[in-house]
Amino acid sequence: WNCPNCPDGTSILNNLKETYGERLVVSAVHQGSFAKPKAENNNLDLRTPYGDDLGSKFGLSSWPNAVINRKIGPLGRGDWETKIQECFANTEHLMNISLGAENTQQGLLVSLQVDALKDINEALTVTLFITESDIKGVQNNQGVMIEDYSFQHVLRNNPIVDMPLATTGLKDGDRVSKNYYFTLDKSLNLNNCAVVAFVSNSAGEVLQVNEIEVEN
């Protein structure tokens, strides 16, 4: 909230989403010194333990910053467009991910299906998490405080991280189906939430990603 350049970063991401549509999945991780809640922002705390872990893992020390596919970065906002273009041009289409989400008494049930399009000869894991949009709060915009800023794609609590998907890899045509339950934080507005799922290789790099909006 106290990152004066983050609204500009958001504008860049919005433009990239307009360009790439569903091919580009954005998740906003609030961490670091600018994210610490204070009275000035009504103590709104959008940090998560997983977000803090990601910040440490990728050595984030300035904001806004981005990591693409857990592989490229961290990058300042001036490099995002070029690097995303390069990523789409050079990344092999190895698999498709299909998702379903249903709110149940036990929590949010997410169904995941992975269809391999080529042979992948290494162990694969899957990570799933919830993002929430239209969270209202205070945001510093180049020194001007916006009182009713709308935060988008915010990483929320209780992710499911690096779960085994295929310990020996997949062959072209293989299909893997799994179900996962999320414990839901009562503060979530499910009408504004989405589930993000990505498959990673043994180096932790993202091979494919998808997201689905949650219907309450």
Label each region the model flagged:
Residues 10-29:
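Conserved helix-turn-beta segment immediately C-terminal to the redox Cys motif
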